[in-house]
Amino acid sequence: MSDGKPMGKLWGGRFSEPTNAFVEAFSASIDYDARLYRHDIRGSIAHCAMLGRQGIIPQADAERIIQGLQQVRGEIDRGEMHYSNALEDIHMHVESRLTEIIGPVAGKLHTARSRNDQVATDFRLYLRDELDAIVQAIRTLQGGLVMLAEQHAHVIMPGFTHMQSAQPVTFGHHMMAYYEMLKRDYGRFSDMRPRLNRMPLGSAALAGTTFPLDRESVARELEFDGLCENSLDAVSDRDFAIEMMAACATLMMHLSRFSEELILWSAPAYRFIRLPDAFCTGSSIMPQKKNPDVPELVRGKVGRVYGALTSVLTLMKGLPLAYNRDMQEDKEAVFDAVDTVRACLRVFGDMVPGIQPQVATLRGAAGAGFATATDLADYLVRKQIPFREAHEIVGTIVRMAEQQGVDLDGLTLADLQSVDGRIESDVTAILSVESSVNARQAIGGTAVATVRTAIAMAKQELAL
């Protein structure tokens, strides 16, 4: 432009000199927000159709604009859009290309709309789609866990506290613990959807608009549950993204804990499970290695998602109402976190059905470490011995077993009675790990029958 104004800027009328070239690159977001194009165009089509219906712009112009937007969408679908930092973001790219196709009438599209409510709408549409994909992926992983638990519901393994053998449980019970964690994750995402699914469009820059919009019809077209009812709030907050990141972070924490156990259990020091070869890699120098790369990567990627949550929280904490350019920085963190979560869910969903528990190793480990000591204490309590006294008695018996180098079921009845004469011959029935496991039949317990009941309920929940 001969007058030195910013070339091609839809906001350039106010300015007397072009934007600094590095500032264009520094402030552009097209490298990462291009993914919003379908949501942006969908929102624009719904907005434009409403402008025509309301008589705010001529119906013929609305139809031309919508046809042009559909053409732009097709071009981007086919990879024909050429991106430029000069156009800043996907919203400007779409409008600029629309202008090239249909001419100045394209400028009517932005009537009664700001990039502030436009971006907020696009972001919510995008996150809604991602949320729906995430909850479906959670269900897939839950299904894999349930099938694995059902197949190995009877397999006895050690349960740990402080990384020490505590009480025997079943492999199925352990897998169902992760099912329950994921069930709550599913609930968190589902619970937030109604809060996410509110439409900001029509709020304009911050104060609303003087045009007679029909926001409700646009909301219905875009499948929103309702409207953002305060224009300042609609364009100013990103709590919906923060809530999404918090749910993602919690989900990833659960996947990380599962990953940690898979890494330990597959190590030669444990040999509790075998991971499928297709989800492991080898070493460039040590030919014997089978490395659990998938769980390790999932465990490592948690930091990215935690970082995204912290990033958006920190970004928003000091911003006065309404929109500030700082808020552009929410997208990259959120996009990366969502991509990471979906990838981790997918790879776990594919890997989990192929996990092979090593039954004999697990059973042997379950019997070590005096894991039935609590059962012995419970046995004494049933003889009307106060639990604290029973605890002391069993502690003495454990020390005796340690000194003899045997487990509890390796002690003779005479050994046991030398500590407390109230112990009788029926004690042998409760010292095996099988008895310990199957005695825990209360809801939530690890008895095989109880676990199978939990599995049946889970299959009903998942419609398996």
Curated annotation (Swiss-Prot):
Record-level Gene Ontology MF annotations: argininosuccinate lyase activity
Keyword Transport annotated: no
Name of a matching Pfam family: ASL_C2
Assigned keywords, A-Z: Amino-acid biosynthesis, Arginine biosynthesis, Cytoplasm, Lyase
Location of this chain's protein in the cell: Cytoplasm
Top enzyme class: lyase
One annotated GO biological process: arginine biosynthetic process via ornithine
EC number(s) from the headed UniProt entry: 4.3.2.1
Entry protein name: Argininosuccinate lyase
Highest classification ranks of the organism: Bacteria, Pseudomonadati, Pseudomonadota, Alphaproteobacteria, Magnetococcales
